[in-house]
């Protein structure tokens, strides 16, 4: 019996078989590539953390090695990831940040030095406007404006902020030109991200001060 390739039943069966084959191939390719994709995502996170520690321009292998050298532990405090790091003998806490910009999600890592000031910062975005809001990621110069800024006051309140006009250069950073709403998102993200881990940051600063005092006493003796 000759197969009627023009019949509706043939077309439906043929199409169904093709769909099954394509779906199988896509699933196979996805599973085959997933470990590589996961590794790339993990490496990107490590690089962003290193950027916040002012360690940049490393290739994949170098970044992996440097991350293993400086990041001593990772924990989660009140829903916030905190990385305990050591850079040139200085204890540094890196806090992960997530928030909303003008057009989508934004994220970042803020490194806190043992003096309670910003050691470094790195920010990322999903869909901010190139040349405007995207500068939170693309402008290393803007990120470096955070370095040395005071993070909290004597009462433990977060005072680090991104503002349109700087009145207090010790705690404030100029917003990105032409991107006030994205900058406001960065400001909110910093405050929302730091509040849950403020106790840990303050404890780390106190411990560092105690260690410094003990070292000074030991040298004097």
Task: For every predicted segment, state its role.
Residues 2-221:
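Flexible, solvent-exposed loop/hinge segments and secondary-structure transition points
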């Amino acid at each position: 019996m000759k197969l009627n390739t023009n019949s509706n039943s043939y077309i439906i069966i043929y199409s169904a078989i093709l769909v099954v084959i394509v779906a199988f191939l896509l699933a196979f390719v996805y599973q085959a590539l997933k470990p590589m994709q996961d590794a790339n995502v993990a490496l990107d996170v490590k690089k962003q953390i290193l950027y916040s520690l002012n360690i940049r321009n490393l290739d994949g292998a170098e970044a992996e090695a440097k991350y293993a050298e400086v990041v001593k532990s990772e924990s989660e405090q009140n829903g916030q990831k905190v990385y305990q790091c050591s850079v040139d003998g200085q204890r540094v806490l890196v806090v992960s940040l997530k928030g909303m910009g003008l057009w989508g999600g934004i994220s970042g890592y803020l490194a806190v030095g043992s003096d309670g000031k910003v050691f470094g910062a790195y920010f990322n975005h999903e869909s901010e406007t190139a040349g405007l809001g995207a500068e939170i990621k693309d402008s290393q110069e803007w990120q470096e404006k955070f370095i040395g800024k005071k993070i909290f006051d004597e009462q433990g309140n977060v005072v680090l902020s991104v503002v349109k006009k700087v009145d207090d250069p010790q705690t404030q950073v100029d917003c990105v030109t032409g991107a006030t709403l994205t900058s406001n998102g960065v400001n909110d993200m910093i405050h929302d991200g730091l509040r849950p881990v403020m106790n840990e940051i303050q404890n780390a600063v106190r411990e560092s001060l105690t260690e410094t005092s003990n070292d000074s006493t030991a040298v004097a003796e």
